[in-house]
């Protein structure tokens, strides 16, 4: 691994990608806490893990370097100095949910250090998987089953940070249960000796909330963002200002697209994705609330200028040519078919090269529609993973794409 962040498109050949094959954290999703943990159902963990391993294998078979978040965090920790190592642990304790009392903080830290004595990887997995109170002293003083809650959404590596050109956005997630996830990216990019980002376009201390599923890099000059339940106007303004101030960037503008405010379909990439220079997959359900704006970096005020027109007109404005629009489930789909395939993230394919995508096999109508439009679909079974409300794009963060 010797590279800098380099993502200047959604469709350039994917060379290196960050993923997280889930562990104990998904074994700890209680039916009592589905809303709290942002899941639609309790998933079968062994099957979900196997599904994710298949996903990773498919990517590797396409000559894509697959980097695991656990491995990268552990490697970074081992290469960091003692001060950075201690700060990483202390920050994790600061952010723990539920909030730790001074006594419970000591217990949690001791547990992590015991895991570290086994291996750094064991410690990292414990940070992600949470701490079962039965594993520690003073269990009878702890309410609930966990001294520290798990992070079951971590396998959606798209959201905690985003690669934008040669820079990154380390995001402030909307919900508390996910906000802790950005700790790992913050630590990696501050301490890894090789992996580097030239600029930081957003940090968790910045105003508003922002998540990677709402961030798209269409080309070297254009970023597209979703204004959604998870990504706010304030956060988009912060990111726009920081890109504008970066004299080394090639980006000229941001386009913002309004996203329906539905809890199970929370990001722009659950409604609209780019498959090739002019090919887009979309859910017709987004059209009722469609709005878009343009922010030019030549404008010191970064004013939001509304774009009039339908989806085809808006995308034509963004890419400079007439788009080929591919509806979820096909042009002849009825509302039930559209709703089902939208619900199971039928737009959320990961584009690994122009007109080559990876996604769930369960979206059969969309799969057929894509192939009829000249898009190669590499499908894998993800019936359990999909219950976390995300598909292949959600489960991946590109680090390096080949320039177009």
Swiss-Prot record:
GO biological process, alphabetically ordered: arginine catabolic process to ornithine; arginine deiminase pathway
Catalytic activity annotation: L-arginine + H2O = L-citrulline + NH4(+)
Record-linked InterPro entries: Arg_deiminase
EC class (word): hydrolase
Pathway per the UniProt entry: Amino-acid degradation; L-arginine degradation via ADI pathway; carbamoyl phosphate from L-arginine: step 1/2
Intracellular or extracellular location(s): Cytoplasm
Presence of the UniProt keyword Acetylation in the record: no
Gene3D superfamilies associated with the record: Arginine deiminase (1.10.3930.10), L-arginine/glycine Amidinotransferase, Chain A (3.75.10.10)
EC number annotated for this UniProt entry: 3.5.3.6
Annotated keywords: Arginine metabolism, Cytoplasm, Hydrolase
Active-site residues, as the UniProt record annotates them: 394
Name this polypeptide is given: Putative arginine deiminase
Organism: Mycoplasma pneumoniae (strain ATCC 29342 / M129 / Subtype 1) (Mycoplasmoides pneumoniae)
Species lineage: Bacteria, Bacillati, Mycoplasmatota, Mycoplasmoidales, Mycoplasmoidaceae
Gene behind this protein: arcA
């Amino acid at each position: 691994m010797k590279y800098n962040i380099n993502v200047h498109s959604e469709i350039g050949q994917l060379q290196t990608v960050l993923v997280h094959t889930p562990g104990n954290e998904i074994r700890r999703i209680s039916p009592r806490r589905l809303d709290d943990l942002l899941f639609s159902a309790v998933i079968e963990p062994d099957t979900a893990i196997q599904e994710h391993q298949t996903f990773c294998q498919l990517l590797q078979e396409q000559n894509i370097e697959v980097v695991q978040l656990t491995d990268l965090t552990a490697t970074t920790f081992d290469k960091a100095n003692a001060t950075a190592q201690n700060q990483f642990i202390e920050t994790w304790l600061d952010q723990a949910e539920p909030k730790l009392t001074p006594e419970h903080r000591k217990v949690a830290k001791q547990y992590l250090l015991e895991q570290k004595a086994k291996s750094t990887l064991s410690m990292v997995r414990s940070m992600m998987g949470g701490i079962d109170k039965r594993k520690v002293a003073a269990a009878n003083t702890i309410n609930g089953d966990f001294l520290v809650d798990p992070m079951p959404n971590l396998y959606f590596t798209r959201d905690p940070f985003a690669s934008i050109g040669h820079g990154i956005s380390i995001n402030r997630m909307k919900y508390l249960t996910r906000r802790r996830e950005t700790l790992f990216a913050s630590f990696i990019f501050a301490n890894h000796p090789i992996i580097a980002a030239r600029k930081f376009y957003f940090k968790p201390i910045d105003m508003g909330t922002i998540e990677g599923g709402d961030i798209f890099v269409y080309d070297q000059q254009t970023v597209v963002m979703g204004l959604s339940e998870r990504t706010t106007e304030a956060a988009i303004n912060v990111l726009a200002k920081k890109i504008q101030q970066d004299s080394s960037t090639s980006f000229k503008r941001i386009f913002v697209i309004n996203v329906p405010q539905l809890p199970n379909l929370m990001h722009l990439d659950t409604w609209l994705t780019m498959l090739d220079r002019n090919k887009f997959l979309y859910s017709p359900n987004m059209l009722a609330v469609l709005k878009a704006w343009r922010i030019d970096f030549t404008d010191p005020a970064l004013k939001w200028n509304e774009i009039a027109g339908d989806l085809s007109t808006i995308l034509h404005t963004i890419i400079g040519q007439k788009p080929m629009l591919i509806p979820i489930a096909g042009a002849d789909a009825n509302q039930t078919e559209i709703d089902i395939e939208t619900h199971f993230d039928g737009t959320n394919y990961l584009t690994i090269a122009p007109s080559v995508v990876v996604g769930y096999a369960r979206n059969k109508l969309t799969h057929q529609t894509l192939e009829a439009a000249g898009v190669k679909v590499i499908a894998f079974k993800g019936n359990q993973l999909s219950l976390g409300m995300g598909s292949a794009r959600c489960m991946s963060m590109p680090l390096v794409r080949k320039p177009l």
